[in-house]
């Protein structure tokens, strides 16, 4: 497995599309998925490869002068629980620190709503994120937004 930082817009968008379309349990709303794909082009982007096959990615989005958000992350289901997400995160966290950011945040659906997102919440907690705030209607009433934060 190798982790690379991508800079080519078309390549970032192709990787984002291929992985998000394979994860409908998390990225099943077409409009939101297309927004993630479009936005990936100008973000700090990391990709995990198994040989030449992209199997996971994440990208960061600046939300303030001192804060960056782990904006979207996806790993193909057959590659879950192999440490790929953790490796992607470590590379991104290291890059964010070198870029001068002091904090990282991530948003997901609040624990206790959906099994898939409960696993996502547990993953973020295992990385060292801490609960910050829940916005009950930021996305909609069925998907309360949990914000996690960490110091870099």
Model-derived segments and their meaning:
Residues 1-31:
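Short amphipathic alpha-helix that is part of the acyltransferase structural core
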Residues 47, 53-61, 67-74:
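Conserved beta-strand in the GNAT
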Residues 73-81, 110-112:
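A short, internal acetyl-CoA/4′-phosphopantetheine-binding micro-motif in the GNAT/acyltransferase core
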Residues 81-94, 122:
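Conserved acetyl-CoA-binding loop-helix of GNAT-fold acetyltransferases
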Residues 96-115:
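Conserved GNAT acetyl-CoA-binding A-motif
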Residues 86, 111-134:
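Conserved active-site alpha-helix within GNAT-family acetyltransferase domains
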Residues 43, 143-148:
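Short hydrophobic/aromatic beta-strand or adjacent loop that forms the aromatic wall/cage
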């Amino acid at each position: 497995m190798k982790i690379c930082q991508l800079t080519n817009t078309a390549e970032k968008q192709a990787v984002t599309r291929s992985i998000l379309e394979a994860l409908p349990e998390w990225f099943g709303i077409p409009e939101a998925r297309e927004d993630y794909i479009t936005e990936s082009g100008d973000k700090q982007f990391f990709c995990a490869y198994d040989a030449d096959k992209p199997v996971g990615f994440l990208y960061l989005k600046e939300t303030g002068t001192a804060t960056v958000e782990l904006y979207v992350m996806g790993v193909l289901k057959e590659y879950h629980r192999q440490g790929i997400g953790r490796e992607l995160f470590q590379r991104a966290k290291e890059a964010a620190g070198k870029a001068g950011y002091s904090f990282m945040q991530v948003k997901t659906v609040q624990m206790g709503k959906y099994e898939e997102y409960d696993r996502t919440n547990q993953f973020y907690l295992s990385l060292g994120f801490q609960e910050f705030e829940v916005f009950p209607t930021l996305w909609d009433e069925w998907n309360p937004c949990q914000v996690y934060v960490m110091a870099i």
